[in-house]
Amino acid sequence: MVLEVPQTERVNDVDVFLSTQDGQIQRPKGPNCRHPVRQKCTNCLPVDPFDEEYLKEKDIKHMSFHAHVRKLLGSQGKGTTLKKPLENFRCSLKPNCDAHKPFPKGICTKCKPQVVTLNRQKFRHVDNIQIENQELVNQFLDYWRLSGHQRVGFLIGQYQPHLEVPLGIKATVAAIYEPPQHCREDGIEFLEDKNQKTIDNLLEMLGLQRVGWIFTDCWTANSAEGTVHYTRHKDSFFLSAEECITAAMLQNQHPNITEYSMDRHYGSKFVTVVASGDESMHVNFHGYQVSNQCAAMVEADILCPTLYTPELAYVRETPLSEEHYITDVQFSMKNEYGAEVMKNGRPLPVEYLLVDVPAGMPKEPHYTFHVGTSNKSKSAKFNVENRQAIGQLQGGANLIQYSSEFSKNQFLEQATNFHFLLYLVTNDQVQISDEWMKRLCDAVKAQDRGTAMEWAQECEDWHQLMALAHANGGSGNDVSDIPVIPNGDPFSGSSSGGSGGAVWNCGHCTFQNEAARQDCSMCGLPAAD
C-alpha cells in the first residue's frame, strides 16, 4: 500500500521544475562582440540568475528564491558536498538542551538565540501575484460596497513559473474564499472556521491551494464618483504592524517545503494583498510578504504592535511567562549626521520587515472558474459563503435560481464555480461523499462535459440536496430544468402515490415509503397532500 504525502508536506511542483532549470540568462551577440557567431566573449556570455548588474538593469528589486539558493550553492565551491545551505532564523530558545535545566533555571550559548540584527531581505519567495480576472476581485469588493465594512478572504490558486524574473515564481489567483469573520467599518476579526479541513480537502481535489490572503482598507471619498481615500503611501504606512504580525502568523502556518534546508522548510510563499485607494483615488491592489526574520520573531511571540503609530512595531519588554525568552533586536539607521548607528527594536519601523510583491491582472483575463457565457447565465449568481450579514444566503432559493439558469447539458458550466463547489462540501443538509466530489472535481479540472452530466444524473446526494432546496426555498422553476433521476421522473412538488396504496413516493426525494408513514424515512419531510 502506497501512502500519498499530504499536499502541505510535499515540495511544490513549481519548485521541482525550477530546481531542474539551468537558470543561466542567455545574452545575444552585441555590437561590442568581435568574434564569430559560435563563439562567446565577456559581452555575451550567459550570466547567473543572481547577477546584480542584470537585476539592476531590469529594475528587479529582489532576486528570486531559487536564484538566492543558486548563489548560496555557488559560493561554497564545486568541491563541497553542502547541498542544504538554507538555515532558518531562530528567535526562541532551542528546546531540550541536555547541558542544563530548562529555562529560566538554566541557559547556555547553544540554546540561546543570537541577537537579531534586522536587514532588508534581498530575495523573495514569490515574485508576482497575478489575479486571473477583474470579476474575481469585484465580487470580493461587493461586500464592502454593500455594507461599508471591511472584508478579508483567502486567495485560492497555485504557484507557477514567472518568466519575467530569473527562476521566478508567481502566485496565480483563481478564486477568493471568504472565511467566517466579524466585519466592521474599521477592522476585521477572524472567527473559528469549522470547515477548514473540508475546504483544504476540496482544494487538493481541484489541484489548488491557499496562496495568500487579501483584505480591504477602503474609505469612501465620494460615493457619487466612486472614489476612495488614498491612505497608504510612503508618508504614512504600507502595512501596519498589526497586519505584519497577522501576515507572519499566516506565513508560519503555510511553510515553504524545500530540500535545501535541514529542517525541510524555509520561509513561506504565502502572500498578502491589500485592496485600498491609490493616487488616483480608485481601489488598487498591493502585494507584500514579511521577511523570514519577522516570521521568526512572531513565532517566538516577541513582536507586538504599537497603540497609536501603525508604522511602528515593538519588541516585548516583559515575558509572557517564566519560560518565555525575549532576545534582543536591533536595526541600523542613519542619524542626523548621516552616520550609520544601531537602534534598539523598541520601537522598530515595519519597513524593515516588508518585501514588496507586484500584484495585478494579465492583459488577457483567464477564468479557471466561470458561470457560463450567455446573458441568461449571468442573471443569477451563486452567493458567496459567509455573507449572512448582508442577506446573501447559500442554498434554498439561491441554489434553485442558480441551477435554473443552466440546462441539463450545461451542468459543467454550473459546477465550474468555486463557491458552488464549496457549498456542496460544506452544506449541513446533505453530505456528499469524497468519492463523488473527487469525480466532479476531476470533471471540472478537465472540463469534461460528459462526466459532469453523468455526475448530475447519477449522484443521489445531489438529487436529495436539490429536493431539499425546493422544499425549503420554494419551487417555481420549469420541470425541465430540474435534475432527473436516471430511468425515473423529474422531481415535482406533489406525491406520485396516495395514502390508499401500499407505498407512496416522496415528492421531495422520490423515496418509496410505506403507506402507514406520515413523513419520508429518507429526507424526513412530510408527505404531500
UniProtKB/Swiss-Prot annotation:
Residues 129-266 form the MPN domain. In association with ufd-1 and ATPase cdc-48.1 and/or cdc-48.2, involved in the cytoplasmic elimination of misfolded proteins exported from the ER. This pathway, known as ERAD, prevents the activation of the unfolded protein response (UPR) caused by the accumulation of misfolded proteins in the ER. Keywords: Chaperone, Cytoplasm, Metal-binding, Nucleus, Zinc, Zinc-finger. It comes from the Eukaryota. This is Nuclear protein localization protein 4 homolog 1. The keyword Nucleus applies. One of its GO terms (biological process) is positive regulation of protein localization to nucleus. It is found in: Cytoplasm; Nucleus. Disruption phenotype: Simultaneous RNAi-mediated knockdown of npl-4.1 and npl-4.2 causes embryonic lethality. In embryos, DNA replication is partially impaired causing a delay in S phase progression in P0, AB and P1 cells; simultaneous RNAi-mediated knockdown of DNA replication checkpoint kinases chk-1 or atl-1 suppresses the delay in S phase. During S phase, prevents DNA replication licensing factor cdt-1 down-regulation and causes cdt-1 accumulation on mitotic chromosomes. Forms a complex composed of ubxn-3, ufd-1, npl-4.1 and cdc-48.1; within the complex, interacts with ufd-1 and ubxn-3. Interacts with ufd-1. Interacts with elc-1/elongin C; the interaction may mediate the interaction between the npl-4-ufd-1-cdc-48 complex and the E3 ubiquitin ligase cul-2 complex. GO terms for molecular function: protein-containing complex binding; ubiquitin binding; ubiquitin protein ligase binding; zinc ion binding. The keyword Zinc-finger applies. Belongs to the NPL4 family. It comes from Caenorhabditis elegans. Transmembrane segments: none annotated.
